[in-house]
Amino acid sequence: MAERESGGLGGGAASPPAASPFLGLHIASPPNFRLTHDISLEEFEDEDLSEITDECGISLQCKDTLSLRPPRAGLLSAGGGGAGSRLQAEMLQMDLIDATGDTPGAEDDEEDDDEERAARRPGAGPPKAESGQEPASRGQGQSQGQSQGPGSGDTYRPKRPTTLNLFPQVPRSQDTLNNNSLGKKHSWQDRVSRSSSPLKTGEQTPPHEHICLSDELPPQSGPAPTTDRGTSTDSPCRRSTATQMAPPGGPPAAPPGGRGHSHRDRIHYQADVRLEATEEIYLTPVQRPPDAAEPTSAFLPPTESRMSVSSDPDPAAYPSTAGRPHPSISEEEEGFDCLSSPERAEPPGGGWRGSLGEPPPPPRASLSSDTSALSYDSVKYTLVVDEHAQLELVSLRPCFGDYSDESDSATVYDNCASVSSPYESAIGEEYEEAPRPQPPACLSEDSTPDEPDVHFSKKFLNVFMSGRSRSSSAESFGLFSCIINGEEQEQTHRAIFRFVPRHEDELELEVDDPLLVELQAEDYWYEAYNMRTGARGVFPAYYAIEVTKEPEHMAALAKNSDWVDQFRVKFLGSVQVPYHKGNDVLCAAMQKIATTRRLTVHFNPPSSCVLEISVRGVKIGVKADDSQEAKGNKCSHFFQLKNISFCGYHPKNNKYFGFITKHPADHRFACHVFVSEDSTKALAESVGRAFQQFYKQFVEYTCPTEDIYLE
């Protein structure tokens, strides 16, 4: 070891690259090999020098800085190395040592400094190993260091970082939170940056030079940005760049001969040891903007381009984060914008070079640990998923206009405030043109498979059957009837489960399908007619229940009355409401239905139907035209008058009419909305008159009176 050191120190012109002890620091490991805390020395194995570097915490950043400074670049090409350059390097080393003077063992460092300067003088012999003269606090670590030889990398252990108080507990910065620091202590730069001794080298720092003490920040900067700068390291990229950009007279990339083999062994061992000690210094790679003399960053793949905007040493590289105290908060916005603009592609050239307001691509790489990277990405992807769902909601909101789920309590129907109805144009065009043929068993406009994919609210429940799709649960509010073989038949049962047929004679059922049961077998199978599909077949009896019908005496009273009023209107739809009466409930339901129907008014106009008002109830039938009567299968929907709780027209636009019905068995209510070319006041008065007659007949039947004649 003495011969090698004397050759390295006193070589003079024979070995120009070895004139300064700091020349080989930047190639301690290959360019593609990254360590979180690399303190290995290539040209020296001196225990005292290694211990000083351990105490000062010299890591990748400082070694890169010492080897990349332009004022010292002359050492790479000078013959014997100037004494002034060596003095500047020694002063920088002393500053690093003085910066940690308030830590335990600072008085002991002065003795090591004298030995170190004596070892660096040209022609000096190897430094003395004085383990017996070391203080008690350093005895154990020094004795371990002296037992190592040049090839004893297998027994090398870090000595000082575990005993010095170099890592005070300070509040976590936003950057360490973003990088998933699992209880990691801050690096030594935090303590150095907050120290009272500034940089005393007396030289002007180049504008783009990386200074590990302050990172191009003024000394009076606060501790929070200093912490961010201290935890960011771009040394893997810059070290490989500096190695390739070195002048021809610079040091080789790897030592020759068997020295390189032992050096590789030591580096491999250090990788195993130092990765376990990452709880002391936790460094993550950050993409640094290229200097004027450096090529574009092609050493890192695109996925390793950057970890956090707040840890970048050059604020000008990401102008979008200017003025924001916590740039990492905008990572949700980044995922939001990236998803909303899928056509953006990453520009060539390795890392992302974004302009103002343009976010980077979502994939991020973390070289710290697999578990932290997975946890970070899972949270990120969860946020992205949440933002993407919000995107879909926002994209549909312009279609709905002023629709909102909280409109149940709305009392003003703004869309009806205008003089003309939003459906007047569509209604006028439809009456001018030939009437469109409707399916025989379809009065519902609930859904059509050939329509555009429009998402409706789940609260919009249509009353009528649809021959093209399954029916909705609001159909159970009334009774379905159709003409079969010239005779009108009402439904007797309602399907409560979906039944998929497995044989040819079985009948397919959907929930709430109206059924006319014709035969009930002893094996609990029904033979029935599905009024929605017009098919016949058998199905299990427990898949349907019997509908509630009016009592026979009420049906007899209704038959005795031949009073019926008919009105031609257009059915808009039905919606379930929370209350059974009230103008505010009626207006809110009209607003919801009208807003939703406005999406389909052009390609699926409202159904033309006939409202028949009688003492028995309200019947909604298909418009009586030739095209429908030719089908021979006229269908209608019937609501018993006793189940109608409220009706009326809109106070601001009397062309809209609606009535609220109660479910025959459940405590549920639905509002059915219609629109007409003319005023619907007559329709509302007709329903009121039907109520009066129904009440009169009901009272006469339930409370009969006897005439008492007094003599």
Curated annotation (Swiss-Prot):
Residues 105-116 have a biased composition (Acidic residues). Highly expressed in brain. Expressed in neurons, localizing to neurite tips in differentiating cells. Also expressed in the pancreas, testis and prostate. Low levels in heart, ovary and small intestine. Decreased levels in pancreatic beta cells sensitize cells to IL-1-beta-induced apoptosis. Residues 127-285 are annotated as: JNK-binding domain (JBD). SUPFAM superfamilies: PH domain-like, SH3-domain. A motif (D-box 1) lies at residues 353-360. Residues 14-25, 139-149 have a biased composition (Low complexity). InterPro entries: JIP1_scaffold, JIP1_SH3, PH-like_dom_sf, PTB/PI_dom, SH3-like_dom_sf, SH3_domain. It comes from the Eukaryota. Belongs to the JIP scaffold family. A chemically synthesized cell-permeable peptide of the minimal inhibitory domain decreases brain lesions in both transient and permanent ischemia. The level of protection is still high when administered 6 or 12 hours after ischemia. This is C-Jun-amino-terminal kinase-interacting protein 1. The gene is MAPK8IP1.
